[in-house]
Swiss-Prot record:
Keywords: ATP-binding, Ligase, Nucleotide-binding, Protein biosynthesis
Catalytic activity: L-glutamyl-tRNA(Gln) + L-glutamine + ATP + H2O = L-glutaminyl-tRNA(Gln) + L-glutamate + ADP + phosphate + H(+); L-aspartyl-tRNA(Asn) + L-glutamine + ATP + H2O = L-asparaginyl-tRNA(Asn) + L-glutamate + ADP + phosphate + 2 H(+)
Gene it is expressed from: gatC
Positions of disulphide bridges: none
Domain of life: Bacteria
Function: Allows the formation of correctly charged Asn-tRNA(Asn) or Gln-tRNA(Gln) through the transamidation of misacylated Asp-tRNA(Asn) or Glu-tRNA(Gln) in organisms which lack either or both of asparaginyl-tRNA or glutaminyl-tRNA synthetases. The reaction takes place in the presence of glutamine and ATP through an activated phospho-Asp-tRNA(Asn) or phospho-Glu-tRNA(Gln).
Protein name listed in UniProt: Aspartyl/glutamyl-tRNA(Asn/Gln) amidotransferase subunit C
Amino acid sequence: MAISKSEVEYIAKLARLKFTEEEIEAMAQELSKILDYVNKLNELDTENVEPTAHIVPIHNVFREDEVKPSMPREKVLMNAPFTEQGCFKVPKIIE
């Protein structure tokens, strides 16, 4: 599956990454190779394979929440493109 340069640019914009023209071309090739590999997995016959979440028995170990010191709000919000009333402001995606 070929990834176009415009798709790489769109993904980079979403991730707030900036690439040179050469990096965009390299990323398009690399992402195309990755998607080709993932598509190969669709060829596997998994009809008789029992669905699992983990290949080994595993369970979550929960702990009590503890309030710990963190970064000041102002410092955290310095990297946010949009803020409002001391919070992150994100585009509305649900009507």
